[in-house]
Every structure is written in C-alpha cells, then in structure tokens.
C-alpha cells in the first residue's frame, strides 16, 4: 500500500 507513503509526504 502506498497510502502509508503519501501520509508522510
């Protein structure tokens, strides 16, 4: 999942 990546963007 990339969701966890964009939340830290």
Swiss-Prot record:
Presents moderate hemolytic activity at physiological concentrations (micromolar range), and weak lactate dehydrogenase (LDH) release from mast cells. Does not induce mast cell degranulation, and antimicrobial effects. In vivo, injection into mice causes moderate edema formation, but induces very weak or no change in nociceptive sensibility. It also causes an alteration in rearing (standing on hind limbs), but does not impact locomotion. This is Cryptide Pep-5. The lineage of its organism: Eukaryota, Metazoa, Ecdysozoa, Arthropoda, Chelicerata. It is found in: Secreted. One of its GO terms (cellular component) is extracellular region. Expressed by the venom gland. It comes from Tityus obscurus. GO terms for biological process: killing of cells of another organism. Keywords: Cytolysis, Secreted. It comes from the Eukaryota. Its main location: secreted.
């Amino acid at each position: 999942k990339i969701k966890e990546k964009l939340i830290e963007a």
